[in-house]
Design a protein with these regions (language model features):
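Histidine-centered active-site/metal-ligand motif
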Residues: 1, 11-14, 140
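Glycine-enriched alpha-helix->loop->beta-strand junction motifs that scaffold or abut catalytic
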Residues: 7-12, 71-72
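Divalent metal-coordination and catalytic microenvironments
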Residues: 12, 75, 151, 170, ...
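Active-site neighborhoods of metal-dependent hydrolases
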Residues: 18, 22-173
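Acidic, glycine-enriched loop/beta-strand segments at the rims
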Residues: 158, 176-181, 189-223
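Functional cores that coordinate and move charged inorganic groups
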Residues: 1-9, 20
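Solvent-exposed coil/turn segments that connect beta secondary-structure elements
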Residues: 10, 17, 80, 214-216
């Protein structure tokens, strides 16, 4: 993780290799992956999930996060992905009206994937969700810039709505509502090098304004 950041990788998505970097087994995990590709690699990554979670070291993670913050790399945790894995699948489909609003071809693809998953969240999925919250909190405390992202339309990650959920999950992980909003506005503008023309509301800048009937700075779900 740190080698990539020091080499110039400006962003990291889905917390890829962040959890691994917070363990003393990062090197052996990565070396094993380098020998594979395609489906065998994906199978290995799944098999490594539990050992990586069990080897998590908070003190090490704090040091890694502080070091990562000095590189300027931005992390896009896409918390909605891990959150989707801990939702009861039948209930998520039957009671969420958004599922019926998804285009038929996307819905068919989702159904094919969801049919292979257990009806209730696994213990491993619950552990991964708790780890996601801990990792995002650690990165935030260390000053690593965070951007809001969703990876929609992954299964049960609804385009549009997922961004609002991501903001709420960032707040759950410890960001203030204002910090979560900046993760979807100012931080991306800085990352793209266009903060002088967008990302904040100011004279001479471009912006799309949304008028709300409640203050998201008090409650992020007011977005």
């Amino acid at each position: 993780l740190l080698e990539a950041a020091h080499a110039g990788q400006r962003s990291g998505e889905h917390l890829t290799q962040v959890n691994e970097a917070c363990t003393p087994i990062e090197s052996e995990v990565i070396v094993a992956r380098r020998q594979l590709e395609g489906e065998p690699l994906m199978d290995l990554r799944v098999a490594q999930d539990l050992p990586v979670l069990q080897a998590y070291d908070q003190a090490l993670c704090d040091r890694v996060a502080r070091a990562l913050a000095t590189t300027g790399q931005v992390q896009v945790p896409t918390m909605v992905l891990a959150h989707a894995e801990v939702q009861p699948l039948p209930a998520a489909r039957q009671h969420d009206p958004q599922f019926r609003q998804v285009p038929a071809d996307v819905r068919a693809r989702w159904n094919g994937i969801l049919a292979t998953l257990p009806a209730a969240p696994s213990d491993l999925s619950m552990q991964k969700w708790k780890a996601t919250l801990a990792l995002v909190a650690t990165l935030h405390r260390a000053g690593v810039p965070l951007m809001a992202g969703t990876d929609a339309p992954s299964p049960l990650v609804y385009p549009g709505h997922a961004l609002h959920l991501e903001l709420a999950l960032l707040v759950e992980a410890g960001l203030s509502p204002a910090e979560a909003l900046r993760a979807a506005t100012l931080v991306p503008a800085r990352y793209l090098g266009i903060a002088d023309e967008s990302g904040t509301i100011a004279i001479g800048k471009r912006a799309d304004l949304v008028l709300l009937d409640a203050d998201p700075l008090r409650d992020i779900t007011n977005t």
